[in-house]
A protein has these predicted regions:
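RNA-binding accessory domains that recognize and position tRNA/RNA substrates
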Residues: 2-179
Length: 179
């Protein structure tokens, strides 16, 4: 299946604007832009609670080649605000694959951006430090004052468990209780 390619923009609080293409959910989002250098483990990254309120960018050039596998998740849901990659694989190849990255992002209302120079954006963040960004289809309407003022709020409350849960083992040897 061939996707319709829609232009989307990453606008950094320092005024830099990067044009890319949209995948995953549609919309607009503000977040703290960070990058990760992992060569794999994108499922774990997407479901890592420490990325709450952040727009996560992968520096590895191709993401999504083994699809999405529920068993590999770090938590029950995704906490990233948006996801940026250089290139993503539309048709993953893995016997464990349950769905593609695009489908996962859509199901979890996460905006994805691909087709941008992640090296240049990473260099900007490395030199200037972590900064806020907005992903939008209309960069002319960005309120840079609002963008600079953005702060991640209620992170701990938002990622903490609200009820007890049990993690079962396939080879049960001991009973462990955490209080």
């Amino acid at each position: 299946r061939k996707m319709e390619e829609n232009k989307i923009y990453i606008c950094l609080e320092n005024g830099n604007v990067f044009e890319g293409k949209s995948f995953g959910a549609k919309g607009e989002v503000i977040g703290e832009l960070v990058f990760t250098t992992g060569m794999g483990g994108y499922i774990e990254t997407l479901t890592d609670p420490s990325y709450f309120g952040q727009i996560v960018m992968q520096t590895f050039p191709l993401i999504g080649n083994y699809g999405f596998i529920e068993e590999d998740k770090e938590s029950e849901k995704s906490f990233v605000s948006a996801y940026i990659v250089r290139e993503w694989c539309e048709e993953p190849s893995n016997f464990r694959c349950e769905k593609g990255l695009d489908d996962y992002l859509k199901e979890n209302n996460i905006i994805g951006v691909y087709g941008v120079d992640t090296r240049e954006i990473t260099k900007t963040i490395r030199e200037a430090g972590v900064m806020n960004a907005i992903i939008t289809s209309n960069p002319a309407t960005v309120d840079y004052g609002k963008l600079k003022a953005y702060k991640v709020k209620d992170a701990v409350k938002s990622v903490s468990c609200t009820k007890p849960y049990m993690s079962a083992s396939q080879e049960h040897k001991y009973n462990v209780v955490l209080i």
